[in-house]
């Protein structure tokens, strides 16, 4: 969880993102921050003036940063890594509105990517591997996800090549999904069932979850034949598990408790 300074700065950037005039520069600065811990520390340092920070970015990118990027590095950040995550988020949000006619198309493609990665664990391990060179990862992404929008491919290639050590590729895609959903004013609900829900069931579930979480809900349905009856729903860290397996487990625990006191 980011500190209060980072949360405040991030909220400010979200409100001012429309002022960003250069999507490519967001990407370039994110890459620079991803590969250089020293640069991250310098750009959040309070001992370095805003003018010096702007000059540093200009030297590294070969061009003067736009006003939005200057504003981002002038804000206060709790930790250096928070500045990197902020640029990643701004790049994804800006991609939603500037590369896609409909943000939902972006989210649907990310869902498609997730389904492939979840079905092929070796793909996640390969794209998360530190030893694999960037050009090999880019070739793999363009091959596996052929036909994806260039905006989607740009985000996937960025995370595959520049993700931080403690993150995995699938985790980064999930990060992107949450941002795009938020840009749509929604939250994602992962629904795991034994068989596909009917349209009526989906509509009813969306209505119930929307009222519970007080926000628009977008369902991502996962079919798992190992799930016996009922549904399992996860929205962020909240889990609602109404499967038969859970009910049987609770029943078994109840019998165990009774035996303890018998």
Curated annotation (Swiss-Prot):
GO terms for cellular component: plasma membrane; proton-transporting ATP synthase complex. The keyword Manganese does not apply. InterPro entries: ATPase_OSCP/d_CS (IPR020781), ATPase_OSCP/dsu (IPR000711). Keywords: ATP synthesis, Cell membrane, CF(1), Hydrogen ion transport, Ion transport, Membrane, Transport. Pfam families: OSCP. It is found in: Cell membrane. Belongs to the ATPase delta chain family. This is ATP synthase subunit delta. It comes from Tropheryma whipplei (strain Twist). The lineage of its organism: Bacteria, Bacillati, Actinomycetota, Actinomycetes, Micrococcales. The gene is atpH.
């Amino acid at each position: 969880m980011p500190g209060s300074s980072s949360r405040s700065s991030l909220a400010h950037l979200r409100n001012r993102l429309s002022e960003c005039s250069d999507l490519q520069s967001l990407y370039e600065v994110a890459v620079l921050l991803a590969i250089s811990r020293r640069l991250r520390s310098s750009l959040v340092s309070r001992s370095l003036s805003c003018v010096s920070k702007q000059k540093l970015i200009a030297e590294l990118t070969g061009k003067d940063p736009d006003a939005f990027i200057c504003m981002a590095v002038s804000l206060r950040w709790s930790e250096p890594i928070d500045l990197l995550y902020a640029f990643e988020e701004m790049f994804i949000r800006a991609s939603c509105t500037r590369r896609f006619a409909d943000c939902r198309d972006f989210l649907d493609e990310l869902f498609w990517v997730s389904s492939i990665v979840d079905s092929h664990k070796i793909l996640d391990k390969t794209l998360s591997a530190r030893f694999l060179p960037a050009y090999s990862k880019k070739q793999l992404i363009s091959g596996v996800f052929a036909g994806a929008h260039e905006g989607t491919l740009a985000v996937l290639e960025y995370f595959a090549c520049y993700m931080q050590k403690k993150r995995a590729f699938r985790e980064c895609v999930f990060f992107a999904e949450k941002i795009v959903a938020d840009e749509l004013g929604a939250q994602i609900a992962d629904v795991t069932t034994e068989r596909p829900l009917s349209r009526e069931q989906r509509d009813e579930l969306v209505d119930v979850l929307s009222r519970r979480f007080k926000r628009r809900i977008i369902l991502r349905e996962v079919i798992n034949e190992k799930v016996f009856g009922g549904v399992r729903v996860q929205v962020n860290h909240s889990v609602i598990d109404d499967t038969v397996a859970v009910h049987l487990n609770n029943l078994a625990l109840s019998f165990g408790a009774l035996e303890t006191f018998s």
